[in-house]
Amino acid sequence: MTKESLEKATFAGGCFWCMVKPFDTQPGIEKVVSGYTGGHTVNPTYKEVCSGTTGHTEAIQITFDPAVFPYEKLVEVYWQQTDPTDAAGQFVDRGDSYRPVIFYHNEEQKEIAEKSKAALDASGRFKKPIVTEIAKAETFYPAEEYHQDFYKKEKAHYEGYQVASGRAAFIDANWKG
């Protein structure tokens, strides 16, 4: 994997703690960073983003090798971590800072995301329409260090939150098997 061959992908799917592990464990992923994007405040803090005044959403930014794990597969993994029918947040996390968004970095990513969204909508997997936003990537601000790799640093807290938030049950009911 050379630096020149690496690309970025940015996804918002509710609490960023829950979004890192599914990508971090895939081949061809160099790093996954938790952070904030899509708003108007420069270098926001977690507290500011949670206040709902920054316009930012919690997101992850992935550095990946598309020759090993193409963007199409990243989008597929993304859908399987979210409730794509809920634009007002994800699971127990409500509000703009938890809205689901696929942020594209180029026209190819935009086209892949739009086609994937249309295919998921047409599949009939969900009774409600797919409302996940697809938007141009903006400045990404890494979150505070204690949020990075949360699933590794705070394993019990992370696993408990996956269950308590309703995310684990939703994924099992809608994406497994």
Swiss-Prot record:
Q: Which GO terms describe its biological process?
A: protein modification process
The answer to whether keyword Heme applies is no
Q: Does the keyword Nucleotide-binding apply?
A: no
Keywords carried by this UniProt record: Oxidoreductase
Write down a Pfam family by its short name.
PMSR
Q: What is its EC number?
A: 1.8.4.11
| GO MF terms, alphabetically ordered | L-methionine:thioredoxin-disulfide S-oxidoreductase activity; peptide-methionine (S)-S-oxide reductase activity
Coiled-coil region list: none
Under the heading SUPFAM superfamilies, the entry gives: Peptide methionine sulfoxide reductase
Q: Which reaction does it catalyse?
A: L-methionyl-[protein] + [thioredoxin]-disulfide + H2O = L-methionyl-(S)-S-oxide-[protein] + [thioredoxin]-dithiol; [thioredoxin]-disulfide + L-methionine + H2O = L-methionine (S)-S-oxide + [thioredoxin]-dithiol
What is the source species? Listeria monocytogenes serovar 1/2a (strain ATCC BAA-679 / EGD-e)
This protein's name = Peptide methionine sulfoxide reductase MsrA
Q: What class of enzyme is it?
A: oxidoreductase
Q: Which InterPro entries match?
A: Met_Sox_Rdtase_MsrA_dom, Met_Sox_Rdtase_MsrA_sf
